[in-house]
Amino acid sequence: MCGIIGYIGPRKASPIIVEGLKRLEYRGYDSAGIATSHEGRILIKKGAGKIDELAKRLNFTDLPGNIGIGHTRWATHGIPNDTNAHPHTDCTGKIVVVHNGIIENFQELKEELLRQGHVFRSDTDTEVIAHLIEENLRITGNFEDAFRLSLLRLRGSFALVVMFADDPERLYIARKDSPLIIGIGNGEMFIASDIPAFLPYTRKAVFLDDGEYGVVSRNGFTVKDIITGKEKRKKVYEIQWTLEMAEKGGYDHFMLKEIFEQPRAVKDAIYGNLEEVPKIAGLLSKYDRIIITGMGTSYHAALVGKYLIQRFGKIPVLVEEASELRYEYEDILDNKTLLIAITQSGETADTVAAMKLAKSKGSKVIGIVNVVGSLATRIADATLYTHAGPEIGVAATKTYTTQLTVLLLLSLELGKMNGVDTTQVENTLPKLPELIDAGLKMNEKIKELAKSLNDRRDFFYIGRGISYPTALEGALKIKEIAYVHAEGLSAGELKHGPLALIEEGVPVIGVAPSGKTFEKMLSNIEEAKARGGFIITVGDDLRLHQVSNVFIRLPKVPEEVSPITYIVPLQLLAYHLAVLKGHNPDRPRNLAKSVTVE
């Protein structure tokens, strides 16, 4: 949530800042702004609205200077308007700040600074930081000391970049519970809240850890501990993503591109984990209790993981949303428990907090993560990467199917350790890309289906057993990007209440692969049809055709594989509904790609 970009080097900063902000739009924002330092002055342009409109109206790229910072704001303190947009300055206009996160003690600090004569222009918590640095600079006369002393006063979460008019060769950065990355170029440096912002210029990155600050010049950087002030050595990561991966490549939207990238992404997830999965499966087999956690789509992947690990690994599994786990499982986590944490970004605030809690209680923590070097990978005892590549669309697609693929690989390895016959499922793995492609070939049919459903106000997705999470995920996609009410339900729950909502013409989407719950699922679908539901089914058994208004037939696969292949038509349905309604599926309202605040 929110985006930060900073640049220092030989080039004009403002075009690079604007380009970086555009690459961070998927994080969600309501206003944007940039600042540069030039000839001893801080120059700022900012406002509420979208970057393209602001850049044109305010001529962002006209700002001179070879050092600059930019920000896309998601409002937390203060309404979205021009004044509350970042960057923010102190009283002198010579200190400028951009900040992601929430300063919890900002009101207390603001009152103190007001008593000292500081004048505030905005309602934001961020502006407090600029004035606090101004006050400490007046006392110390040293830029770095003033910066660090100010950081010590802040409570809450922050990723921030500070620029001084009187110190035009350095940017000052800090992180606590919000991501911040240094991009290392050739005689130039970049700061960003996510990798795509500087991907056109460098693939070398350093990830700040919580409680660290840094001083960045065009030729290097130092990173220190906020509390002790001691310098820390940092690992430089080589990012494997290419610039082309983070561009639309001829598709109308990133989401559609990412849906169609799933055959490649799943293949990469399989072959990228051949060595690591056996090691981590061996670790899992030593534990009597496993908890899987995540948020949003990653939580739905966790639910599938529960079915897979229990079925093949014969180990009891609990699944909990990370936002709940960290408050309700404090007395359950111990050194006999293993936690699997699933997070695409590796920076999801609630998931990271749950991982930290588990570690503090002596639990082993395994991460299933997409972004190399992210905070979750540095907290976890071991990490399985999903190898999905950059996912720009806010609604998760390829990162979901690759999470499921990793969980399937892990479960199969556990099954082999337990003497379970995994042959049928293992034989399906090399065919997964073409099986996913079969769903993608339904694109035109699903587009026509979406047209017929465009006026419907309620959708009900039903599934049983391992297909229940697929129903949840299908419903989430509709809600996220088409802004239509949708519920994902366990089909067995229909007659316990939800059936009262089924009436003539209400779409009911049944996720019904062949397997041990199919007969029951068929009965549940017939119940919904008898109440007038418009029945759409996804499955392989031709009996579904007889009870369906629309039957989306997919190749028959082992039930354990079906969550990977059956979600594809549901992703396409959500996408086409969103486009038909005139919504941008890449940037749904009120949502952000990475939820980095609690």
Curated annotation (Swiss-Prot):
Residues 2-219 form the Glutamine amidotransferase type-2 domain. Keywords: Aminotransferase, Cytoplasm, Glutamine amidotransferase, Repeat, Transferase. It catalyses: D-fructose 6-phosphate + L-glutamine = D-glucosamine 6-phosphate + L-glutamate. InterPro entries: GATase_2_dom (IPR017932), GFAT (IPR005855), GFAT_N (IPR047084), GlmS/AgaS_SIS (IPR035466), GlmS/FrlB_SIS (IPR035490), Ntn_hydrolases_N (IPR029055), SIS_dom (IPR001347), SIS_dom_sf (IPR046348). GO terms for biological process: carbohydrate metabolic process; fructose 6-phosphate metabolic process; protein N-linked glycosylation; UDP-N-acetylglucosamine metabolic process. PROSITE patterns: GATASE_TYPE_2 (PS51278), SIS (PS51464). Disulfide bonds: none annotated. One of its GO terms (molecular function) is carbohydrate derivative binding. The active site is at C2 (nucleophile), K593 (for fru-6p isomerization activity). Residues 280-420, 449-588 form the SIS domain. CDD domains: GFAT, SIS_GlmS_GlmD_1, SIS_GlmS_GlmD_2. Homodimer. Catalyzes the first step in hexosamine metabolism, converting fructose-6P into glucosamine-6P using glutamine as a nitrogen source. This is Glutamine--fructose-6-phosphate aminotransferase [isomerizing]. The lineage of its organism: Archaea, Methanobacteriati, Methanobacteriota, Thermococci, Thermococcales. The gene is glmS.
